Amino acid sequence: MMCSTRRLASRKMQLGKIHPTSNKETGVAHWIRYEHNGNRGFGVLDGDAIAAFRGDMFHDPVASGELLKLAAVTVLTPCAPTKMIALWNNFRALAEKLNQAIPPEPLYFLKGNGSFHPHGQPIRVPASYSGKVVYEGELGIVIGKRCHAVSEANAASVIFGYTCINDVTAAELLFKDPTFPQWTRAKSFDTFGVFGPVIATGLDPLTLTIKTILNGQERQNYPVADMIFPPAKLVSLLSNDMTLEAGDVIACGTSIGVGSMKAGSEVSVVIDGIGELRNRYE
């Protein structure tokens, strides 16, 4: 069942209220992509309005002077990545709970581009799978410029900002075949790569806390500071494996509290300073 126009409008208004006003002095801004009257655009979110920009979000964007009401647009994913790299076993608390060794290097997979999905739109029950589907609230790193083999010391210069991610997973598929773990299939159903609603710039990620709310109840609450490979190190190590493009997203992995969703569930990933990524599982 598609969300009603009234419900979507309500979510858009709520989206605008949960973000702090952009602060030029601190450099904090909340970038958003949208569709308005059939045209796609991007801008900076300020309360319940969007200050529109033109050009390239990642390279000297220019303010257009146009101001749009958030309730009048359709929210898109905040960028269009060429890839989403997603981490496994990147938090100490979860590694300890699962009795997993601390990995010597990042363990990761890629989510299919067709899975990318925005705030406010329903996550779909897969037609070809009827098992358990779980939420995974995560921090996302958004790359701001093309890079390869970046040092950890210089990694901050290629990070544009941070976003919220729900790394939705068909959990029973992961190890269904004993000869081949199905990470790609389990993670890449249409609508399973949920991220947004904004990219926040000017934040110190190590001060952030990630919460996941399922049907009004908090299920995850964990600090980014518990990360085994923090953002700068991740970007450095991953960029030595493959070239990262502007707009690429790194999902930093999740921690304790992952759980299943049932049809009709409302799930939100909340990171103070970034915002709330909210979707319904249908």
What do these predicted regions represent?
Residues H148-Y162:
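N-terminal accessory regions of nucleic-acid-interacting proteins
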